[in-house]
């Protein structure tokens, strides 16, 4: 009996070891890139005295996650690994997504003029402001320039032009594009569906749309935002993020027309070369992307940059999301610079393939 028990135990252990070995072999994570991305993020968090941060690097065509880095600091101690990649909050990266929806209507294009005035736009009882309102605003600019300078007013006025007084049609289009997906990812615990306040909700108000289209009135995780940006890089094909190697799963074969996608890709590259995204500019490879900052309910901030490279033939999409208490905050100077450092590291690995 004891001999039989030993054999059963040995087989069980061997089976567990085989399964563990299989999981290790099938992991999509590049261990070298994971270490380098961790070092880059930790250095930036320390430099700006941030509370926590996340970096996720995805392979454009397959959705394979090549690095998944999370760091947090408690009680002013050293930064420690954090595995909560399901955390959701408002995002400063909504402007391009709203613009893509507007482009899909065919009623606006990047060269259209939009007057943002002195940087303050009254909507019912609230004021929508651009970041430079205290310097007199941008005046009349193009839709493309509005994206490059992260103009909240340009984004909302573009939505008004595209959708008129029918915000529900905007939300219907976002749903058609699968914004906020996926709802679950193998290997990421507790990921929930993104939460949006829409005209169908009791929380809806006359100002809700203006703030939604720039990233508020919603809760979304960085990896869900990354999934949408990756679809832009992938010419409209949205694929499921994967932490374990498997066949590529397509969420949406074409989130928007190729013409709209191409227009947005030009705008995202312009945002880095000529807009507020310049800190993400790399002299090693052309990049495209968007920076953003969102203020949270506890008066802390999330600063982000999401983009892809090479811009003309995207191989990787990267999101950098940093949580920081107190000013100053800057999506471009903080998250964008981190993005650039990661791009430079990835570029070196690409040229050695």
Regions found by a protein language model. Name each.
Residues 38-47:
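Short, basic/aromatic recognition patches
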